Amino acid sequence: MSVPVVTVTDLYHPPEDPGDNVDLIMGYGLDEVDLRAVILDALDEKRHLVDGGVPGYPGPRDPGIVPVTQLNAVYGHNVPFATSPFTRMRTPYDTMTEVPAFQQAGIDLLLDTLQRSDEKVHVLSFGSARPIAVAYNREPELVAAKVARVHLCGGTSTPTYLEWNVLQDPQAMIRLVSTDLPIALYPCATEESCYAHDRHNTFYRLHDMRWIEGMHPALRRYLGYALGRLTRPDYLRVLDEDLPDEVMEPVYARSHDVWETAVWVSVTGRRIVRRPDGTHRIVRGDDVGPGDVEIRNEQLPCRAWPHESGLYSFEPTDEPTPTSVFVRDDPAEYERAMNEATPALFQSFRPPEPWHGDVRTDDREMTR
């Protein structure tokens, strides 16, 4: 049975963090996911930012309409998408009704998707969480009734380091963590940085991206277009053609920082396992074999409370609680496992053949 999902992502075009372009493939490629909508979470200052962000990916940039359209085309889907407010919330209770209509569309889409769903929906936040907080401020009863869980990817395992997603909108984080909504917390950073490891943050690093070469051709080209920062306007036709080595080789050589995989593993009920032969895979729960050893990727019940900075604190509890926090046992072991399991998962994704941008042979003949 598929899991209804709305993903809220600070995905940009050209990329600000190429991890968002990579991560969105999960929503399309995982069979267990019924992707109902994509809400584009943009911030005006990031749109105009030239320096800063991930090295090698300067701005300016705009909301990721292009990559969502590309994946819709590759998979033959029509997942709706819309942008949300470009400015921060002024207070935790801000409804942001005064922003331009174009920027209202993402909040309207989120609320409409919840309203139309006969099942509770998992809402995944890979950004500021502003669209979710504003939607809750506008329609708290609807959100409470229709959200299965908010999966909040952001924050710090100790409230000392101002993590990037929190910085994008502290008021949004304060609002969500203060509610009684069921929330799964996935801290991105430790007290040191967002590139350090501990048991409660989700970060790991892929040593290179050579594995993209083994992906489905359309998905390989999609990532080449994004991670290679191509400016071609024919962003659908580019998916029909292999990109030159001078574009792809620098992409393959990059390391890649990841925070999002733990969320998708949790939402789908998948497991990270070490097989008896020593290989690592991300598998369905019912595909765990008797000789497999599970690599912990779990949610631990906790109490959580926000701070004025937008960061939060948490403590494990045995009491009933709507809140939980990510936990793993050995971050180094986790990273070793994911350096094998994550590439294998992406290489397993197979969009419909031929991909839906292909022109039929008889049509090609007619154009000659």
Where are these regions (language model features)?
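Residues in well-ordered beta-strands of folded domains
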Residues: 82, 151, 265
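Active-site histidine-anchored catalytic micro-motif
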Residues: 2-51, 55-62, 91-201, 205-206, ...
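Sec-exported extracytoplasmic/periplasmic mature domains
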Residues: 73, 178-181, 224-227
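Intrinsically disordered, low-complexity boundary segments flanking structured domains
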Residues: 25-26, 66-71, 139, 250-251
